């Protein structure tokens, strides 16, 4: 990948997604784009980028962007945040709202572990919540909606008793149970877009997201 192509990738990421792509990630970007190029029918990353610059195609552009986003996440990441959510915030809000469901937004939910962790915390607190979990990546959302995780993914952050209580094993996957699924709605959203009147929540989780966003758009 040439420095010029990387500069254009930086502009693409910033203009469409608001994310910054720093120069030290150039080799990583080229490595990640290899499978995308092959999937899209190109022999090389350079050939794919040349085609993209010549005729910008929305689907190809988003495929490139999604591949360069950081999907890193796991269950109950930063455990203290979820303990505070379940043991302090939810009870206080529930009392203030007279038992009405608490509306929660998981912004930048990636592959869903944060949203399911919030649902588990609410279930264990015995408090009704409605969780909207959004992300820019369609591929990440597909996995999130499936609620299916590998043994490694499910054990990364969850104790065995929690895993067995809230997930069913199906061959090599662990799948979120119906009680959790009823609480979470996944949708695609760009955090850089202006919010609508429907975006009204009692609690917003937006964690490990803004560090990758252009400072001017945070």
Predicted regions and their residues:
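Short, well-ordered alpha-helices that flank and scaffold nucleotide-derived cofactor binding pockets
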Residues: 87, 91, 120-124, 146
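Conserved SAM-binding loop of SAM-dependent methyltransferases across substrates and taxa
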Residues: 111-127
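Short strand->helix junction
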Residues: 19, 74-75, 111, 194, ...
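Conserved hydrophobic residues forming the short capping helix/wall of the S-adenosyl-L-methionine
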Residues: 37, 93-94, 122, 148-149, ...
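Extended basic-aromatic, gly/pro-enriched interface segments that bind polyanionic ligands
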Residues: 107, 129-205, 209-217
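Conserved AdoMet
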Residues: 1-105
């Amino acid at each position: 990948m040439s420095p010029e192509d990387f500069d254009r990738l930086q502009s693409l990421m910033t203009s469409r997604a608001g994310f910054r792509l720093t120069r030290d990630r150039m080799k990583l970007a080229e490595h990640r784009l290899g499978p995308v190029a092959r999937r899209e029918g190109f022999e090389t990353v350079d050939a794919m980028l040349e085609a993209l610059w010549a005729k910008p195609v929305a689907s190809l552009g988003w495929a490139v962007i999604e591949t360069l986003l950081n999907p890193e996440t796991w269950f109950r990441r930063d455990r203290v945040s979820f303990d505070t959510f379940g043991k302090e915030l939810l009870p206080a809000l529930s009392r203030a709202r007279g038992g009405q469901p608490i509306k929660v937004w998981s912004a930048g939910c990636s592959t869903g572990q944060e949203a399911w962790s919030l649902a588990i915390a609410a279930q264990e607190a015995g408090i009704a919540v409605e969780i909207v979990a959004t992300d820019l990546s369609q591929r990440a959302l597909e996995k999130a909606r499936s609620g299916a995780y590998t043994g490694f993914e499910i054990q990364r952050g969850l104790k065995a008793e929690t895993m067995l209580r809230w997930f069913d094993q199906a061959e090599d996957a662990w799948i979120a149970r119906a009680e959790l699924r009823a609480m979470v709605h996944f949708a695609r959203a760009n955090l850089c877009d202006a919010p609508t009147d429907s975006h009204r929540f009692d609690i917003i989780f937006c964690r490990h997201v803004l560090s990758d966003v252009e400072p001017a758009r945070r």
